[in-house]
Amino acid sequence: VDPDKTLIFRNHAGELHDLTFRNAAFTQDHYLNLSGGNDKGTFSSSLGYYSEDGQIISTNYQRVNGTINGSYKLLPVLTVNAGGSFSWSKMPDLWTYDLKSPWNGETGEYELFYRTMSMFPTWNPWNEDGSPAAGWSNQDGNPYYWKDKLTRSTTNRKTSFNIGFALEIIPQQLFLNGNSSMYYTDYQLNCSKRSISR
């Protein structure tokens, strides 16, 4: 660069892409199972954990799930069984939602990919002081700036329980079975907005 000339444009090609997307994503998947029993009763249980990094930096998905089931022969003709299962998952949503209606779902995900991949190389993603520049808006601006200013996460929790019995009325011929179950689900959306300077 000639120090006697004014620099009008600078090449920032690829910077926005590198600030937005991961080159590699890490995934974990763990599973544990236990089971056993005797002539009186049986049981089985499992526990799982799954974690996956998103393609976009600062996004990921996590899930924990488990089950437990058991049966026990109270009398020679009566067996009871019970069990339960649960699932918990959490993932952050992108910051590209409508600022006036943050609960209405995603409205600008395609802008994030389109703008990031097609941004002209002379666009500077940095302010003069070295901080990330906001760009045009949260939907098509600088993801590196907006990812910490607008945060939203979705959490799901699902739980089920069951209990039942089997009564042998006539040996090997007639049985009376009864079962009942309960299912509970909880959905939570968290949204926060930090100070924005543009």
Give residue ranges: language-model regions.
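Surface-exposed loop/interface segments of Gram-negative outer-membrane beta-barrel transport/assembly proteins
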Residues: 1-13, 24, 54-59, 65, ...
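Ligand-site clamp/hinge motif
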Residues: 50-52
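N-terminal periplasmic accessory domains that precede
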Residues: 9, 30-32
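Residues on the lipid-exposed face of transmembrane beta-strands in outer-membrane beta-barrel proteins
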Residues: 32-38, 66-72, 161-169
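C-terminal beta-signal and adjacent terminal beta-strands/loops
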Residues: 19-21
